[in-house]
Amino acid sequence: AKLARKMLDDAGLTDTGVVLSNDLDEFTIKSILDSGAQVSSWGVGTKMVTAYDQPALGGVYKLAAKRLGDEGEWEPIMKVTGQSSKQTVPGILDIRRYFHDSEKLAGDMVYDINYGISRERIVDPADELRQKDLSNKRYITLLEPLARKGKVVLKDEYRNALIARDYCREQLELLDESQTRIVNPHSYPVGLEYDLFYRRHELASRLLGLS
C-alpha cells in the first residue's frame, strides 16, 4: 500500500485512492495503519459477515428465582459448580448504569430488586478484592420487560433494529477511549451489588455443604 501510494503520487495521480481487501479484520487494519500506510478505503467482507472470531453464541438461559403461584414470594435460586465463574447470580435482577460527572460511563451494577441496594458499591463476582464505589453518581436502570404471563409487553421503540443500533453507538461513545482500543483495552467495571455478592456466596456455600 505504501509503495502503491508513492508510485501514484510520483505519477501525479494524487487523487487516485488506494483500496485494500482480502480477509481483513480490525487487527490487520490497525497493523497496516500503524505502519504508516495511506489507505483510502477498506474492503471487509468474510470476517465481518461470517462472525469469524466466534461463529457460535454460547448463551444459555439460567433460572434465577422461583415462586408458587402469582402471589407467592420469590425464592432466589442458583446453579452451583466447582467453578465459581460458572455459578449463576440468584434473584430478580436488574442493572443500574452509572455515569461520571463528565457523562462518561462509570460502571454497571447488577442488583436484586427485591432486596434493593444497601450501598452503591460493586464487587467483581470472580474476585472479591476488586470493588468500585459508585456512590453519588447519576444512574439509569437498563432492563425492560419483554413478556408478562406469556404475552409480549416490550415497548415498540425497543423493537426497532435501527433504534437499537443507534443506541449501541451512543453508549459506545460514552466509554473511555482506553476501554475501546483494540489492543489491551481496559475492562469496563461491571459487578454485583455489595450485599448481593455476599448473599450469592453464602447460598453457594450452603448448597455445596460448605457452611
Which residue ranges define each predicted feature?
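A small/polar active-site loop signature that marks catalytic segments
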Residues: 2
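Small/polar loops that bind or transfer phosphate-bearing groups
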Residues: 20
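Gly/Ser/Thr/Ala-enriched C-terminal appendages of enzymes
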Residues: 6-11, 16, 24-211
